[in-house]
């Protein structure tokens, strides 16, 4: 390109006054001084001095190229005419491919090393043909390899033996969860499950968790009849089961998260009862009931006091169990 700007034409023809800027133009010009037609058609008498002209002829008539000739007229088997390629000029066949024997000359007793040739097509294709359509199964395209099966079969057995072991820990965790949820029901007195619509069917785990919620909700209201750490029996429930509370208990299945707050309120109630030992038992129980009713609807995380149990329970449901301030 710079030679065109500078007007320099260093390539001169030895037979005439022609000069050009590159070697390829000079080679094309030298063909005009020769009578040898290097590129010929194998299906007809067409012959030309230029490779591009032969490609156009082969594309137009669907013919095949003949062997390329040298500048002196001798045949040259190395160049390959790529009819539909975009590269200008003939392709050069590598010397190693020309001098390789076509027939199988290796000894049968010696194992052949793995070569990147296809097992069916042999040396005709130097690659494994990734574009081959998957019309045949894998066993028909490739010969069986016992070493590969022996290497992969122990791993398959190990995977099959490890699967039951991997499945067993979730089963044990499930049994622990079921035993944990069934333990309060066995220890306490028998009571009917909370009311729920007959159309809704739930699993045993989800059916038992509202009862735990009912026991823990009792810790907030009936603190005068329960000791620290032991939930009162369900028969002494103070708040009646209304459709609103039944729906709320079914929706909120993790009410046992409020147990630390209930224990803290129970300890405060015990301290107040110890301080008022001179009063009668009826007066002490009334004061404890009134104080617990005033403080049982308070969120210990947000310092918010609610007017009734419904709003307090809905609010406490938004606090996480591990992290109360994480939604």
UniProtKB/Swiss-Prot annotation:
InterPro entries: Ikaros_C2H2-ZF, Znf_C2H2_sf, Znf_C2H2_type
An annotated GO BP: regulation of transcription by RNA polymerase II
Amino acid composition bias (Basic and acidic residues), ranges on this chain: 205-216, 265-276
Entry keyword Transport: no
Zinc finger (C2H2-type): 1-5, 11-33, 39-63, 297-319, 325-327
Chief localization: nucleus
Protein name, entry field: Protein hunchback
Protein encoded by which gene: hb
Region (Disordered): 91-121, 143-170, 182-290
